[in-house]
Design a protein with these regions (language model features):
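Short S/T/G/P-rich N-terminal loop/turn motif that feeds into the first structured element of a domain
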Residues: 1-68, 72-85
Length: 85
């Protein structure tokens, strides 16, 4: 399943990338490909191909992720994507 996660937070793009890169290895269990678009400082769009939605949801609700979200007041909006052609 392809999804888009739009994250808005009170930090920098570098803050987000540090968190993303630190958790990327763990996430290899549930995704195969991704692209990150920087909308502006404090807002990114992550397009990602999820292979195991249950593991993705576990990662998104982990203590580590909740702590990051609280520290940076992060709000994630998750959209499903479908190829249209």
């Amino acid at each position: 399943m392809n999804i888009c996660v739009v994250s808005t937070f009170d930090g920098t793009t570098d803050d987000y990338m540090k968190m993303f890169n630190a958790t990327k290895e763990k996430a290899a269990d549930f995704f195969t490909d991704y692209d990150i678009g920087i909308i502006r400082e404090g807002k990114i769009a992550l397009m990602i191909h999820i292979t195991d939605m249950e593991k993705f949801q576990e990662a998104m609700s982990s203590e580590e992720m909740q702590a990051w979200d609280a520290k940076f007041n992060c709000v994630d909006e998750v959209y499903s994507l479908e190829l249209m052609n």
